[in-house]
């Protein structure tokens, strides 16, 4: 429930589905485990897990959904070795080289044999729909993983008018100005980590950790055409995170003081605690996200 990464999207049209309508449409793409011949499966699961009963969870107008992916683990080297052995044996027996289509058919046979015995790996991706602010946020460490969830949601509901948030100024320019001037917007403070990249196409990369970012050494790098492409920040003493030049937020952490606010919620009802945590997280992020956009110079356009 405590998001660790944020990939942020803006609705280009208002999200008007009710929770009940969304629930019905998600059911058509509910997750089912891999069958013996499936290499992967992707679908919706209950965001509250065993403590929930629906594919959606809502609190104060915010909606939480969760997608699960199961993938069969088939090491490419194993398949390649088995294929090479089969090809060699058949070519020796028949005295001719196999054609490309024949090799592909053999590979399919090998996969068909191995899949039922392959181990599975599962992962879950949460997403938060904020209709009031026309925002959708995916807890994913990469844009690709977020795109997978968005594609599944689009398939489930027919259309999903969202785009990555576009700012008036590139984030790397603004972050570079912050380090150059040593002056951050209100409520934001520097931490001790950054990534600097050369503005040149094949230039160098400098990664700083556990370092004072206001030193002359850092300023010299910036003076030599380096741009800040990742920057560790703190907001309001409640959130710490690493901001990327693609506007992604990673390694998001909530302060202990914030996390303890729901300690009075009974532990005898896990669903109630999860609901309270979701309400707390979304309330905080609903304030943080517009503050971040404003600090970075504002959005290019929004509905």
Swiss-Prot record:
Q: Where in the cell is it found?
A: Cytoplasm, Nucleoid
Q: Which GO terms describe its biological process?
A: DNA recombination; regulation of DNA recombination
GO terms, molecular function: double-stranded DNA binding
Keywords annotated in UniProt: Cytoplasm, DNA recombination
Under InterPro entries, the record lists: RdgC
GO CC terms, sorted: bacterial nucleoid; cytoplasm
Q: What Pfam families is this protein classified in?
A: RdgC
Q: Where this protein primarily resides, as one coarse class?
A: cytoplasm
Signal peptide coordinates: none
Role: May be involved in recombination.
Q: Which HAMAP family match?
A: RdgC
NCBIfam families given in the database record? PRK00321.1-3, PRK00321.1-5
Give the protein family: Belongs to the RdgC family.
Q: What is this protein called?
A: Recombination-associated protein RdgC
In the UniProt record, the gene name given for this protein reads rdgC
């Amino acid at each position: 429930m405590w998001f660790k990464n944020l990939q942020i999207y803006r609705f280009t049209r208002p999200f008007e589905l009710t929770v009940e309508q969304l629930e019905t449409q998600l059911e058509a793409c509910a997750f089912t485990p891999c069958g013996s011949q499936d290499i992967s499966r992707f679908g919706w699961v209950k965001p509250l897990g065993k403590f929930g009963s629906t594919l959606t969870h809502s609190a104060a107008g915010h909606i939480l959904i969760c997608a699960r992916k199961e993938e069969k683990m088939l090491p490419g080297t194993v398949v390649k070795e088995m294929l090479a052995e089969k090809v060699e044996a058949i070519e020796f027996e028949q005295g001719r080289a196999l054609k490309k289509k024949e090799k592909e058919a053999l590979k399919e046979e090998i996969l068909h044999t191995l899949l039922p015995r392959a181990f599975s790996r599962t992962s879950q991706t949460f997403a938060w729909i904020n209709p009031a602010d026309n925002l959708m946020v995916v807890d994913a460490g990469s844009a690709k993983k977020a795109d997978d969830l968005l594609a599944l949601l689009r398939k489930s509901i027919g259309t999903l008018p969202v785009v990555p948030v576009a700012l008036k100024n590139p984030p790397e320019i603004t972050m570079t100005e912050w380090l150059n001037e040593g002056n951050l917007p209100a409520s934001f403070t520097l931490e001790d980590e950054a990534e600097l990249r050369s503005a040149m196409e094949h230039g160098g990369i400098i990664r700083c950790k556990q370092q004072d970012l206001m030193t002359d050494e850092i300023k010299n790098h910036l003076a030599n055409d380096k741009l800040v492409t990742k920057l560790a920040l703190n907001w309001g003493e409640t959130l710490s995170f690493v901001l990327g030049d693609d506007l992604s937020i990673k390694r998001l952490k909530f302060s202990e003081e914030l996390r303890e606010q729901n300690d009075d919620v009974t532990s005898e009802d896990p669903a109630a605690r999860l609901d309270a945590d979701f309400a707390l997280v979304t309330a905080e992020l609903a304030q943080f996200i517009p503050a971040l956009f404003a600090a970075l110079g504002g959005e290019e356009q929004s509905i």
